[in-house]
Structures are given as C-alpha cells and as structure tokens.
Amino acid sequence: MANQEFTTGSLGRRQFLKLAGYGTLGVLAGGTWPFIDLSAASQLEAADRKSKFLPDLDLSLIARPAQVPIFPGEPTQVWQYQAIVHKGGRDRVIKPPRSYLGPIIKAHRGEKVRIRFRNDMPEKSIVHWHGLHVPAIMDGHPRYVVSQGESHLYEFEVKNRASTYWYHPHPHGRTGPQVYRGLAGL
C-alpha cells in the first residue's frame, strides 16, 4: 500500500526522460549565449532594420572622458560629446575649434533626425534637446538615464523654426556637474 502512494505522485520513466531531454536542450541552447553578437553596434543595426523611421540625418553621439589642452601645460580632464555621422553629410556636424564643448549639429525644420546616444562616462547620463519640440520619450527626461556602456536611441522630426538650440545632459541631480565638465553642444 505504501508503495502505491509513492508511485502515484512520482514521475513515470517516459515522462522523466522527456523532461530530461528538454532540460538538456535548454542547457545546450543556453551554452551558445556567449557566442551571440550583442555589441551595441549590432543591436543598433538590428533596431534600424526593424524601424520604419527613415532619417535625413543619422548620427552617433558619444559622451566620454577626454583630455583637452585648455590652458598651457597639462591637458584638462573633461567630459565631451563626440559625433559620428552615418547619413546626412559630414558638414552637418561641426566641431568648434579650440573648444572642449560638443559638436554643433545642423538640422532643418521638417527633417527626421536619428541620434544614437552612447554613454561611455563613469556615471549615468541622458541628453536633453533644450527647446526642441520633441515627443516626451525623446526629450532626455532623467527617468531615461543610461549607465556607462549603455545607449539610448532618439528619433524625431524637427518642428522648430531656425534658431540656436543647445543640448546638454539631464540626469537627476547631476546636470550642472556634467555640463561644467564639458557636456553641452548646439
């Protein structure tokens, strides 16, 4: 009688082998994980293929530590934005001479802009497009901060008239210190 109670709640041989087979497949499939390309570039390329957003201007904006000769002597440690244009012409991004500030980004009303922000700094950050009329999720709100090594994709249409607008970091409680160190551009 005790033997019947034990076998009623137990797995049968076939069911056990079936579950063991599924487990083995799961372990083997999981073992390929380190070989899958999860680089930021491949993730952005995959997102581009899925997106129906066709930008007129497409660039990467990278926040990173740098050393810049601001005064004679030793270079000054700063944080700065660097841009790489993927589409739209290299003349759309201008690095101001003798400045540690970020590049000037030229965009026109009605253009669709894609900016791939990557944070290579030792603290969280996000980019706020000061004065531009963009959707809330694209406005660099502090709740969207990204950690070091992470990225945030901005896609928006420029709806503003011609003017000078600046962009800057917008992490909660760290906007000022990050701007003072050089994270700002036009």
Task: Please place each PLM-identified region on the residue numbering.
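Short, intrinsically disordered low-complexity segments
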Residues: G12-R13, D48, D91
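Histidine- and aromatic-enriched segments that form or immediately flank copper-ligand environments
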Residues: I62-L186
